[in-house]
Amino acid sequence: MSPAQIIRTSHSFPPSFTGTSSSAENSHAQSPQQVLTRAFVASGELNAAFGRTSTASAQDFTSLLGTLQRELEKKTPAFPDLAELANQLADAAMGDQGGHWLGRDEQQTLKGMIDRCKSQLAHTPASDASYDLLAQVCENLKKARLHQSISQMTGEAHAKVRGVPDLLALIQLDPDILAEKPVGMPSYVKFSSFICMAKARTAELSENLRNASNEVALLLHPHADTILEQGSLRLQIVGF
């Protein structure tokens, strides 16, 4: 599927990310997704689509991950502390210089924590006092995992699959923002440049899938959970 097709099909977002048309011009009423879309269109930079920045929290990701894992494994976790740690972890993961936490151990640890958290949430009644905090923990862990995957798939070693992060960025765009009248052509010029690069990288990805499928599979396998999570979310959005 081309980036243009993806933009057309992702026509709505979950209630928590949906703004009203009457408040579209009010920056205070914009959904997080709309804010990110505006930033992405204005800059034409991949990091803007995910809210990634070089000024993100400088906290040590690996240290936070270990602390969070120990707290989650307690027989009776302190859920407010757990939620705060997960929030700090997600913030730390948003930095665009995250190479130090891309080791296999960190990936497996985080994926294991997400599975544990999702399982625990599934067995927690919605009426339980800990439910909302646990749901928040799960969302922040998945957010950290997304940024972990983006950091790795945009690295030189993953050049053959560089089109994947571009596609993940494009499916998160808010079509209502894209449909607005251009406020300034320079913004759209930058975004158009990104689209051109994304089309080229997606074409290269398609070619690599045909001619180097085993290598591509090895590169993508560690990030299958991220890709499936994002794809599943978009399918839920469009009603499948």
Curated annotation (Swiss-Prot):
| Protein name per UniProt | Putative truncated effector protein hopW1-2
Which keywords accompany this UniProt record? Plasmid
Task: Please name the gene that encodes this protein.
Answer: hopW1-2
Segments for region (Disordered)? 1-32
Q: Which family does it belong to?
A: Belongs to the HopW family.
Q: Name one Pfam family in it.
A: HopW1-1
Could you say which residues form the signal peptide? none
Record flagged with keyword Plastid: no
> Which residue stretches does the UniProt record annotate as biased composition, category Low complexity?
9-23
